[in-house]
């Protein structure tokens, strides 16, 4: 399967650099998976598309201010993007510098260079950094870090991004990118969903910087996914099984919720889904058999990305690419701060030919 089959033309003007004034004020493109029919509307229309007893599964990860600027004590400037917090004083990070730091290199981090760290070891593309500070890592990041806006948002981060690039229900610090489908849900919207009898459950997947890495191979099957830590606790498993038993739908809010639930289903030995705690490298592309998800709320994704492949596996390749062409023609806003889609599962998608 060719990566190029998932390309589409996107004018630069359709990339959203700021969110809407109101979280739930974005547009919503609804795609009926079985028929391919498209409906244009606004995000609050989602209320009318869900039935009492349906289950929304959110990702409650919280974005950390993971981007740090500084220099080596010896002089060279560098940029650090924390990928994973290992403990109170150690992180794994990407480091951009004219010359990669060697183990033992001392760093001065923060706009005022007030925080000392040491490069302890290298693990392939990642660097293990040890912070020489009495504060824990999360406190340091909150004090001196910048919000890690995606590379396609071509502007410096602003103070407002600490709130805007964060879901209102985020609880578990650890992500370096927001689960962006969740950005559209505000408190009034959540209250209205509860009022209608919509059930809610929360997984955790700490989104890594790898989510923005381009696919660097020509053939999809040759791509190796990055690892991300996910948790699907017992209460989520119980909610999913109860939802299925009563004939309702499991609706994932975002591709990270999809990957969490489907990882738990893949790893399950004795039931459709069991609790899951660990790293996942699940790669969902056309031909994949969905085990849990019945519908999906998601944003518009980058051309040739693993996420548009995931959507194509869910809705069907032709349906997905046609919907994206229509979204461009209708000038929907794309990517993290952009508009949303509501998609129902196409059971024929896994048999469909791509290209």
Swiss-Prot record:
Enzyme Commission number(s): 2.4.99.17
Q: How does it assemble?
A: Monomer.
Q: Which InterPro entries match?
A: QueA (IPR003699), QueA_dom1 (IPR042118), QueA_dom2 (IPR042119), QueA_sf (IPR036100)
Q: Which domain of life is it from?
A: Bacteria
Q: In which pathway does it act?
A: tRNA modification; tRNA-queuosine biosynthesis
Return the Pfam families for the record: Queuosine_synth
Give the enzyme class: transferase
User: Where does the protein principally reside?
Assistant: cytoplasm
Q: Which family does it belong to?
A: Belongs to the QueA family.
Q: Name one GO molecular function term.
A: S-adenosylmethionine:tRNA ribosyltransferase-isomerase activity
**Protein name in the entry:** S-adenosylmethionine:tRNA ribosyltransferase-isomerase
**Reactions accelerated catalytically:** 7-aminomethyl-7-carbaguanosine(34) in tRNA + S-adenosyl-L-methionine = epoxyqueuosine(34) in tRNA + adenine + L-methionine + 2 H(+)
Q: Which residues form the signal peptide?
A: none
Q: Which gene encodes it?
A: queA
Role description? Transfers and isomerizes the ribose moiety from AdoMet to the 7-aminomethyl group of 7-deazaguanine (preQ1-tRNA) to give epoxyqueuosine (oQ-tRNA).
UniProt keywords, alphabetically: Cytoplasm, Queuosine biosynthesis, S-adenosyl-L-methionine, Transferase
Please state where this protein is localized. Cytoplasm
Query: Which terms does the UniProt entry file under GO BP?
Result: queuosine biosynthetic process; tRNA wobble guanine modification
**Cellular component annotations (GO), alphabetically ordered:** cytoplasm
